[in-house]
């Protein structure tokens, strides 16, 4: 049975994904970050305490994992939280990628955001080949998602099989 790890499992995308993976006969492991299990209460999931911003907490979680679905993110548009946004979205993604690569994970699926892409000029279609946000004065969340995507691409070049 394929073991899938979901980061951000208590969020909307993660909680929805849990149900779909269980329906497809995956064994599902979740990072228990905040003890909030309401999103998947009563479901057959393996919970292991951890925090993507603390790399040392991830090694045990990644043992025997076949595929990682990285949905975790700190979604906030308030510039006052720029350091926290960057720590979770960029540094956390780097930790997930690094541990996945070194643990022999076969595949990682990274959940990015439309906000990672430069939306200007506004009247053009926003396609996935659009340039990533690179303006240091951009909304911190947008820049963090763009930089997280760059991290994933960097690890793809190091040998981690990824989809974004």
Q: Residues of each region from the PLM?
A:
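SDR active-site strand-loop-helix element
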Residues: 7, 31, 68-72, 108-114
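Residues forming the Rossmann-fold NAD(P)(H) cofactor-binding site
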Residues: 14-16, 90, 146
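Conserved glycine-rich Rossmann-like NAD(P)H-binding loop of the short-chain dehydrogenase/reductase
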Residues: 26-35
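NAD(P)H-binding glycine-rich loop region in Rossmannoid oxidoreductase-like domains
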Residues: 45, 49-91, 99, 119
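Conserved cofactor-binding/catalytic machinery of classical short-chain dehydrogenase/reductase
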Residues: 54, 91-95, 107, 147-148
């Amino acid at each position: 049975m394929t073991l899938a790890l979901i980061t951000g499992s208590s969020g909307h995308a993660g909680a929805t994904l849990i149900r779909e993976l269980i329906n497809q006969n995956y064994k599902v492991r979740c990072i228990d970050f905040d003890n909030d299990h309401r999103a998947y209460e009563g479901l057959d999931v393996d919970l292991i305490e951890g925090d993507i911003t603390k790399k040392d907490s991830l090694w045990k979680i990644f043992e025997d994992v076949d595929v990682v679905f990285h949905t975790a993110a700190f979604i906030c548009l308030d510039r006052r939280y720029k350091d926290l946004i960057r720590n979770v979205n960029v540094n956390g993604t780097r930790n997930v990628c690094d541990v996945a690569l070194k643990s022999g994970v076969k595949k990682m699926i990274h959940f990015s955001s439309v906000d990672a892409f430069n939306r200007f000029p506004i009247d053009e279609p926003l396609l996935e080949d659009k340039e990533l946000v690179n303006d240091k004065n951009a909304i911190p969340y947008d820049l963090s998602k763009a930089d997280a995507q760059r991290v994933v691409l960097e690890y793809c070049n190091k040998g981690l099989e990824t989809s974004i």
